[in-house]
Amino acid sequence: QLGPIFDKKLESVSISPPLPAYDVTAHSILSSVTELYGQELPRTMLREHYRCAPEIIEFCNKMFYNSELIAMKAKSSDDPWPTLMVRKTPPGNHMRTLRRALTKGTYSQREIDTVEELIGGVVDGVDFREILGGEESGSDYMLGIATPYRLQADRLSEAICSTADLPEMSSLSETIHKFQGRGAKAMILSTVVDESRIGHMKLRFVDDPRMINVAVSRAKEKFILVTNHDEVPRSKIIKALIDYVRFQNPNQVTESEVLSVFDLLYKEYSERLNE
């Protein structure tokens, strides 16, 4: 369970919790209760998992649950679309952090463009509009796009609305924290971070195992990771996720076709711009 994210202004409020276990800045509800009662607290592992396709939840099972989960959902035998995909941006450091603008935050326009590329039509033989066909299930979404950063989520939401040829469907672009308790037929995770010095500094937040666990396990049938061209080599969990997808299907780790003349400003840029 992910803990809440607080406004930095609250750090100046000098109200101390009665006990460390009640410190809302350090604990989620689950960790608070565990801290209070310790080993006296009864624990039950809910082993049967019904939400995700087996290929999706197996990553979480091996990475976070010591292989104790039992996948109860079977993949449809007539489903031609890949369950797992990785879509990489072209070479370059595309993350930006706005500090002095009216809108502050961290985002990657190239990853936003890559998501638009995915949901706007046919990519590597996969028609995303067909993947999103069918009926909605309960309160879940047809398409979910999760990201660690608020600004990225907001700009992705705007991108979804501007994709005119998408069918009418239930979609949500939100931070990973806001996706707790929710699910989507197809889930996209945008990591945002790049290989710049600031990107490396932000990796500790983005590569949190609880964050990746929540993001991946929201996907019911399809999961797509959108990340930087170098595959976040300094990460642990994200790198393991990419390796897992590559092991399942090497052909589903691909590079985005989205290019920009501004890529020429980077030391490393796509050779396609020389054509």
What are the language-model segments listed below?
Residues 1-275:
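Conserved helicase motor core of SF1/SF2 NTP-dependent helicases
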